[in-house]
Regions:
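Extended, charged catalytic domains and RNA/DNA-binding interfaces, predominantly
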Residues: 1-251
């Protein structure tokens, strides 16, 4: 890995090489104080339409990261009030979400299945109730990692949005870059409980997946010319689907 991260002029070339129209480059714990200079609260000037690059934040190596890493997209401000770096952030993910959603961010957990693949048992009286291909299943995860751990609590909350209206604390669950049965199982159970949360494609490059960007992709329906704002709002509204990019043509 680069010692201080990948610069925007390099990241836009990765997007173009994989024909990704939109890429979110997330500043995280290691090298945060170097990478934070690339955040502008808008698309990066290196973007070459339709290839659009934007810098935002993954809460990883921060105060609340043990509750599960969070992807905070479409931020206006990248640093939680009270400091200039990453050490002073809340220890509870929901408090980070309250701050992010107040400024109009679209949020969800990163690398969701980390912490969901070790089991401590299963729900009683659920034998023979697992679905086809083990989806959904009723194994109880240990929640012992940095994925969608606090997610199942946060998804039940509504918190104030930019104008004070109550909106969902979580917009999506990240998928496609970690163990997929565990990712989809969490999503299925949340949907079955009545919470409408989108699935979002993810590639944790170059930390977890050094092969290439675009291993997990999210395709969003937008009206008119593509912009980052239209794309991210379509994901929040569920006007999207995920794919690995190999079979994505729909009529």
């Amino acid at each position: 890995n680069p010692t201080q991260g990948v610069k925007p002029e390099d990241m836009i070339r990765h997007l173009m090489g994989e024909d990704l129209k939109v890429g979110c480059c997330l500043t995280w714990g290691p090298c945060f104080d170097f990478q934070k200079r690339f955040f502008t609260g808008d698309v990066a000037e290196q973007s070459l339409y339709p290839y659009t690059l934007r810098y935002d934040v993954e809460v990883s190596g921060f105060g609340s990261h043990m509750s599960g890493h969070l992807n905070l997209l479409n931020l206006e401000d990248q640093i939680y009030p009270g400091g200039e770096s990453k050490e002073h952030w809340p220890t509870l993910g929901l408090n980070t979400l309250r701050w992010a959603k107040k400024q109009g961010a679209i949020c969800g957990p990163a690398h969701s299945s980390i912490g969901l693949t070790n089991f401590i048992g299963r729900l009683e009286n659920t034998e023979a109730q697992d679905g086809e291909n083990n989806l959904p299943n009723f194994q109880i995860p240990a929640f012992d990692g940095i994925g969608a751990n606090e997610f199942i609590v946060d998804v039940t909350h509504q918190i104030p949005g930019p104008t004070g209206e109550l909106i969902p604390a979580v917009d999506f669950i990240s998928t496609m870059n970690t163990e997929r049965v565990a990712e989809w199982n969490m999503w299925y159970h949340v949907l079955n409980c009545g919470f409408r949360v989108a699935a979002c494609g993810e590639t944790d490059f170059p930390c977890m997946s050094g092969e290439r960007v675009g291993i997990g992709r999210v395709y969003a329906k937008v009206d008119g010319p593509l912009t980052f704002e239209k794309w991210i709002q379509s994901i929040a509204k569920g006007r999207s689907y995920v794919s690995d990019g190999y079979c994505h043509l729909l009529d």
